Structure formats: C-alpha cells, structure tokens
C-alpha cells in the first residue's frame, strides 16, 4: 500500500509543479490520501448481478471492469453454466508410495526382535558347550 501512496504523491507533485510553474511544492501524503478513495479490487456485484451466474457467485473485478463468476465446485464456464464431468484434481486416488513405507515403530520392533533372537541363540549355544565335559572337547 505504501508504494501506491508514494506514486500518488509523486504524481501530485508533478501536476502541482506544472500548475504552479515553479512555485514551492507543499503537497503532503495526508492531503493526497484524504482526497482518494480506496476501491477494493474485487467486490460482490450487487443487484445488477442477480441471476448473472447460474451456479456461482457474481464478482465485480476492478481490473477487468466487468462481472466475473466464481463457480461452485463441479461447475465451470463464463457464467458457471457447464457441469464438470470428472474432477481429476479432487478425486481421491490411493497413495501407493506411502503405503509401502514402514513406520519407524515397526522397524524398531523388528530390529529389537532380531537382536533378541541372536542373543538367545548365543546364550543357548554357550550354555550347551559349558555343560559338555572337558574330555569330549579334547581331541586324542
């Protein structure tokens, strides 16, 4: 918004300089902003737009200086008169890429289970070898 006011101030200074033909310029930003009205870029049409849009809201856009329709979901066209048969943007497709990614919790449980199985195997193997008599372990 400040750029808009600076441009208005600059334009007013130039106009005054031509009008005053060399006199001192005493225009301030408050003088310019008090005289200008701020028109919104987009506003509702009002009574003249009743019935203009078939399936949507009538909007008056300052840039195009005319009525414009903002269509409801499922409709398209200048006056929202056409039905959209297939809406690809809003159709829900199964997200296959994320369904194959395991969660960190599952990976952690699987890793702990593998470590526990390895420790159990080592414990049983060392227990068996400790129970054998020394004679069986010595080769003649």
Curated annotation (Swiss-Prot):
Q: Where is this site: Cleavage (By host protease)?
A: 96-97
The disulfide bridges present are: 45-58, 53-69, 71-80
Q: Which residues lie on this side of the membrane: Cytoplasmic?
A: 122-140
Supply the SUPFAM superfamilies for this chain: EGF/Laminin (SSF57196)
Q: Name one GO molecular function term.
A: growth factor activity
**Record keyword Zinc-finger present:** no
Q: Mind listing the UniProt keywords for this protein, alphabetically?
A: Disulfide bond, Early protein, EGF-like domain, Glycoprotein, Growth factor, Host membrane, Host-virus interaction, Membrane, Secreted, Signal, Transmembrane, Transmembrane helix
Chain ranges of the EGF-like domain:
41-81
Residues of this chain annotated as glycosylated in UniProt: 34, 95
The UniProt similarity line reads: Belongs to the orthopoxvirus OPG019 family.
Give the protein name, as stated in the record: Pro-variola growth factor
Species this protein is from: Variola virus
The coding gene here is OPG019
């Amino acid at each position: 918004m400040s750029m808009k006011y600076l441009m208005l101030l600059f334009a007013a200074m130039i106009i005054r300089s031509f009008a005053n033909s060399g006199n001192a310029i005493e225009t301030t930003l408050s003088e310019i902003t008090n005289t200008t009205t701020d028109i919104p870029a987009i506003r509702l049409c009002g009574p003249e737009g009743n019935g203009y849009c078939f399936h949507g809201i009538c909007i008056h856009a300052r840039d195009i200086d005319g009525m414009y329709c903002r269509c409801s979901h499922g409709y398209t066209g200048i006056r929202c008169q056409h039905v959209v048969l297939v809406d690809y943007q809003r159709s829900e497709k199964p997200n296959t890429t994320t369904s194959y990614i395991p969660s960190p919790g599952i990976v952690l449980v699987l890793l702990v289970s593998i470590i526990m199985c390895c420790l159990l195997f080592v414990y049983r193997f060392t227990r068996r070898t400790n129970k054998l008599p020394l004679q069986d372990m010595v080769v003649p």
